[in-house]
């Protein structure tokens, strides 16, 4: 595969994730779409590390670091979602605007 193929794949994944994050009402689906967007960025990091002007492992290391950060973000997001569900008995984004008791 060439660099443009990887970039096209990352663009498609990012656009799917952005569409889902902006249009879906379920918070779990929104979190999954955000993770999809982060994975598209990781594909770019690895592709530029392989096909860039100075190939090296820096892109791979940065992608692994981004995956670790994304895992922590997903854990915090799901913990907040569980707390929200216990309070409101729903996971809809529309209900998140009224977080007062």
UniProtKB/Swiss-Prot annotation:
Protein topology in the membrane: Multi-pass membrane protein
UniProt-recorded Gene Ontology molecular function terms: NADH:ubiquinone reductase (non-electrogenic) activity; quinone binding
Keywords for the protein's UniProt record, in alphabetical order: Cell membrane, Membrane, NAD, Quinone, Translocase, Transmembrane, Transmembrane helix, Transport
InterPro entries per record: NADH_UbQ_OxRdtase_chain4L/K (IPR001133), NUOK/Mnh_C1-like (IPR039428)
Top EC class for this record: translocase
Cellular component annotations (GO), alphabetically ordered: NADH dehydrogenase complex; plasma membrane
Assembly and binders: NDH-1 is composed of 14 different subunits. Subunits NuoA, H, J, K, L, M, N constitute the membrane sector of the complex.
Listed name of the protein: NADH-quinone oxidoreductase subunit K
Gene symbol of the encoding locus: nuoK
